[in-house]
């Protein structure tokens, strides 16, 4: 996981919706334990308190340059009545740079199933410019590179699961197999179910089942 984060340039993941997304909570916790990634959880705090906790932490850790914020509250980034934001105002006050802040948020057009895709979109190097700022469209499930990055992330932290893949991807066997082959040395294959979604099976199990047909 540490190699993955170095590759994609992320030092920290900040999330305030872990309890709503248990699969990602487990994934992120495992990632933190295995790589030393700094993770902040502020699930139960009000918006202003969450913003304060995040900005305080980052102001005390200037070495952290890029961070993700998971939150369902749009006002954390932008208030309804003007262009200011809880985080933006506090960042200015505390001297925290916000150029690399990424907010993943339901109000921006995606639901629980697409959280995986949104993260992967932002982790893709294809959407990072010369200043190391993400230019990826938020929550674009079809964004080039997002599926590959998601699978790589899940595989790297040992969380490549049938349920996550079935919920996150609607792609055919050929595309999925091509992506996964480069990561798993062909020890996992993807098969498309009757609903058009995919699941994975160990290669040996798949070949044995296929031979019986």
Model segments located where?
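Short, internal active-site loops enriched in acidic
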Residues: 18-21, 74-75, 206
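Terminal-proximal interaction/regulatory segments of ATP-powered molecular machines
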Residues: 136-213
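C-terminal cap/substrate-recognition subdomain and adjoining C-terminal extension
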Residues: 26-131
């Amino acid at each position: 996981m540490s190699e993955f984060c170095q590759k994609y340039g992320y030092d920290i993941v900040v999330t305030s919706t872990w309890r709503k997304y248990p699969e990602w909570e487990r994934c992120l916790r495992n990632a933190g334990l295995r790589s030393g990634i700094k993770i902040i959880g502020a699930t139960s705090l009000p918006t202003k308190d969450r913003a304060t906790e995040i900005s305080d932490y980052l102001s005390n850790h200037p070495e952290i340059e890029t961070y993700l914020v998971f939150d369902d509250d749009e006002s954390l980034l932008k208030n309804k009545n003007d262009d200011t934001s809880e985080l933006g105002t506090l960042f200015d006050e505390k001297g925290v740079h916000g150029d690399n802040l990424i907010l993943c948020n339901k109000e921006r057009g995606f639901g629980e199933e697409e959280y995986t895709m949104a993260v992967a979109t932002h982790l893709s190097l294809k959407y990072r410019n010369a200043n190391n700022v993400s230019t990826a469209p938020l929550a674009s499930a079809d964004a080039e590179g997002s599926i590959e990055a998601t699978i790589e992330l899940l595989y790297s932290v040992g969380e490549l699961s049938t349920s996550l893949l079935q919920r996150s991807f609607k792609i055919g066997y050929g595309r999925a197999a091509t992506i996964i082959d480069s990561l798993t040395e062909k020890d996992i294959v993807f098969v498309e179910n009757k609903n058009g979604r995919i699941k994975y099976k160990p290669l040996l199990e798949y070949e044995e089942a296929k031979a019986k047909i």
